[in-house]
Every structure is written in structure tokens, then in C-alpha cells.
Amino acid sequence: MNRSSNSAFAPTEKKLGLYPVVDSIEWVERLLKIGVTTIQLRIKDKQPKDVEQDIITAIKLGRKYNARLFINDYWQLAIKHHAYGVHLGQEDLDIADLDAIKQSGLCLGISTHNDTELQRAKRLLPSYIALGHIFPTTTKDMPSKPQGLRALKHQVEQTHDFPTVAIGGISLEKVSDVVATGVGGVALVSAITKASDWQQVTLKLLELVEGKPSC
């Protein structure tokens, strides 16, 4: 692993709130327009040169709407174009230059799927830690089993020094139970992007997660 020096990454909000994870500029823009303030652009399996313009545009949108825009995986481009933050999976930690990310002043989020990965993430002192997957999910092939609400609550209690984000199979119907665990952020993918009325669902999620009125 490309170890980082023994100091914390840039801080972010303790409660990141509703945290959609989307794969296009179109989704970034439409969600920021209706009040989302934390969002991740997750484009997978493309060469950096093929995603650079989208990353530039996403970062500009983040600034326009004063939002926390995280770039998944493409940490070099995130540094180059001064993103708010980067999100890395466990496999990315082995190859990313964590010191370069830290020295650039970017926030860092790390995915975890069990207690071993959680302890590893905590040692790196990231800006936030993602805990998952909570429920079965079809968005991403997962080698691990769903952790469930009880495990999530335990992990949140063990991670009180860090902002936490729950992810994985979280639907509109389940989000209140997730929030009740004390987790500070709720990441969703298909609950928004596959909704028949994405705008209504997003506004309702903002109400349930952040207390923002939906009308």
C-alpha cells in the first residue's frame, strides 16, 4: 500500500447527509439543482483521457452549487482539477498515492465492507468512511455479504471520530431505519436513478435524511 504520512486528510462535514452516487454529468447537474449538497461521480472502467472532461465539468458544477463533489477512483485527475474530494475502494488504496492526495488538500473517503477493512481505513485518518454494503444490491457485484442494520449501528458507534456514510441496497423505504443508526450520510444509487419520479424521490430522501422540507 502507498502509505500516507501520519496526519489526517482534509476534514469534511460530520454529517454528509444524502449522498447520491451517479455515473454521468447529467445526473450530477440535475441533483445539485434540486438541493443535493454531497455527491459522487463514479465512472468505471474508462481511461483517464476519456473521463477527464466529465470530471472537469463535474467539479465546475460542484463549485457552482457550493456542493461537496467527490470523484471516484481517478485521483490524479481530481488533484489536477482541484476537486473537493476523492473516494477510493480498498483495492484503490494499494495503488493510489495517498500522500499526493493529502498534500493537495483534497478530502478522502474510503469504502469498507467488514471490520478488518474498517480498522485499516481508520489508521489512514480519512475525511470519511463508507460502511457497506448494508442490504443486498444489484448495482455492483459484491463478494461480501450484506451487513445489515445491527452491524451498521455497531460500526457507527466504533467510528465516532470519523464522519460515516452507509451504502448498499438502501431504498426510500429503508432509509429511515438507516438514519436511526446514527450514521451521518446515506449513499444511494438506483433508489434515485431508477425511480419513476427521481425528483420526488430525491426531495423525499432529503427530507428523511437531512430534515429538508420536500415541498
Swiss-Prot record:
Top-rank EC class of the record's enzyme: transferase
Binding site for 2-[(2R,5Z)-2-carboxy-4-methylthiazol-5(2H)-ylidene]ethyl phosphate: T137, T138, T139, G169, V189, S190
Annotated residues for binding of 4-amino-2-methyl-5-(diphosphooxymethyl)pyrimidine: Q40, L41, R42, I43, K44, N72, S111, K140
Domain of life: Bacteria
GO biological process terms, semicolon-separated: thiamine biosynthetic process; thiamine diphosphate biosynthetic process
InterPro entries attached to this UniProt entry: Aldolase_TIM, ThiamineP_synth_sf, ThiamineP_synth_TenI, TMP_synthase
Residues that, per the record, bind Mg(2+): D73, D92
One GO MF term: thiamine-phosphate diphosphorylase activity
Obligatory cofactor(s): Mg(2+)
EC nos: 2.5.1.3
Cofactor mode of binding and number, as noted: Binds 1 Mg(2+) ion per subunit.
Pfam hit, one: TMP-TENI
Catalytic activity line of the entry: 2-[(2R,5Z)-2-carboxy-4-methylthiazol-5(2H)-ylidene]ethyl phosphate + 4-amino-2-methyl-5-(diphosphooxymethyl)pyrimidine + 2 H(+) = thiamine phosphate + CO2 + diphosphate; 2-(2-carboxy-4-methylthiazol-5-yl)ethyl phosphate + 4-amino-2-methyl-5-(diphosphooxymethyl)pyrimidine + 2 H(+) = thiamine phosphate + CO2 + diphosphate; 4-methyl-5-(2-phosphooxyethyl)-thiazole + 4-amino-2-methyl-5-(diphosphooxymethyl)pyrimidine + H(+) = thiamine phosphate + diphosphate
Recorded coiled-coil stretches: none
Keywords: Magnesium, Metal-binding, Thiamine biosynthesis, Transferase
Pathways involved: Cofactor biosynthesis; thiamine diphosphate biosynthesis; thiamine phosphate from 4-amino-2-methyl-5-diphosphomethylpyrimidine and 4-methyl-5-(2-phosphoethyl)-thiazole: step 1/1
GO cellular component, one term: cytoplasm
Purpose: Condenses 4-methyl-5-(beta-hydroxyethyl)thiazole monophosphate (THZ-P) and 2-methyl-4-amino-5-hydroxymethyl pyrimidine pyrophosphate (HMP-PP) to form thiamine monophosphate (TMP).
NCBIfam families: PRK03512.1 (NF002904), thiE (TIGR00693)
Family of the protein in this entry: Belongs to the thiamine-phosphate synthase family.
Protein's UniProt name: Thiamine-phosphate synthase
